[in-house]
Amino acid sequence: MKNRILRPALLCVAALFATTAQADAGHDHGSAHAGAHAHDADTPYGRPGDAAKAQRTVRVVMSDTMRFDPATITVRRGETVRFVAANGGRIEHEFVLGTTASLKAHAQEMRAMPDMQHADPGAVRVAAGASGEIVWQFTKAGSFEFACLIPGHFEAGMVGKVVVR
C-alpha cells in the first residue's frame, strides 16, 4: 500500500523538477531578447561573425570605475571585428552589443535575474582579470552600443558606442 502511494508521489516530484529545469534552461536571455539576439540571425547592428574572416581585433578594457576603454569604436559597414573584452577590474563585467532599446530592456531583465548567463554570440561575461571574445560582422550603418548589463553597472554608465560607417 505504501509503495502504491509513494511511487506516484515521487514520480510527480521528479516530473516537476524536470519540467522546472527544462523551462529554466532556455532563460539565457528571456523572451524580450529572443528576436534581438538570435544566434545566427541578422540584428539591427549586424550578425555573429566568422573568426577566420575577422579583419581586425579591437581590445576593450572593462574597469571597476564602470567604464570601457575605448568608449567609442568606429567600424566600416560589412567589417568583421574580433572584440577582446579584457576585465581589468576585480569584479565580473560583461560586454554586450545591442541597440539602445535592446540594452535598456536587457538591463531591466538582468535586474530581475542577475545571475542570468548569456547564450548569445553578441555577449560575453568576463571574470575579474580574465578576457573574453566576440566576433561580430557589422552589416548596417548606424550608431549602436555595447554595455555591461550586470545590475548597477549599466546604471552607473558602463556603456560604449560603436559607430558603423
Curated annotation (Swiss-Prot):
Mutagenesis / variant outcome for changing residue 148 to S: Loss of activity, cannot restore copper tolerance in a deletion mutant
InterPro entries with a match to the protein in the record: BlueCu_1, Cu-binding_ET, Cu_oxidase_CS, Cupredoxin
Binding site for Cu(2+): 93, 148, 153, 158
Chief location category: periplasm
Effect seen on changing residue 113 to S: Loss of activity, cannot restore copper tolerance in a deletion mutant
Keywords: Copper, Metal-binding, Periplasm, Signal
Resulting phenotype, residue 106 to S: Loss of activity, cannot restore copper tolerance in a deletion mutant
Compartments where located: Periplasm
Record's keyword annotation contains Metal-binding: yes
Highest taxon above the source species: Bacteria
Consequences of knocking out this gene: When exposed to copper, the deletion mutant shows reduced growth under both aerobic and anaerobic photosynthetic conditions. Mutant is extremely sensitive to copper under anaerobic photosynthetic conditions. Mutants lacking this gene are more susceptible to copper than the Cu(+) ATPase copA mutant under microaerobic and anaerobic photosynthetic conditions. Periplasmic copper accumulation in the deletion mutant affects periplasmic and membrane c-type cytochromes.
Effect noted on mutating residue 37 to S: Does not affect activity
Molecular function (Gene Ontology), one example: electron transfer activity
Recorded consequence of changing residue 118 to S: Loss of activity, cannot restore copper tolerance in a deletion mutant
Effect caused by changing residue 27 to S: Does not affect activity
Pfam families: Copper-bind
Signal peptide: 1-23
Keyword Signal: yes
CC annotations in GO: periplasmic space
Residue spans of biased composition, Basic and acidic residues class: 25-42
Segments of this protein annotated with the region Disordered: 25-50
Job of this protein: Involved in copper tolerance. Required for copper resistance under both aerobic and anaerobic photosynthetic growth conditions. Binds copper. Could be an important defense against copper in the periplasm and may protect not only c type cytochromes but also other proteins with cysteine residues from copper ions that may catalyze nonnative disulfide bond formation.
Subunit (UniProt): Monomer.
Family in the record: Belongs to the CopI family.
Domain remarks in the Swiss-Prot or TrEMBL record: Is a green cupredoxin able to bind a maximum of three Cu(2+) ions: a green copper site (CuT1.5), a type 2 copper binding site (T2) located in the N-terminal region, and a third site with a yet unidentified location.
Name used for this protein in its record: Copper-resistant cuproprotein CopI
Encoding gene, per UniProt annotation: copI
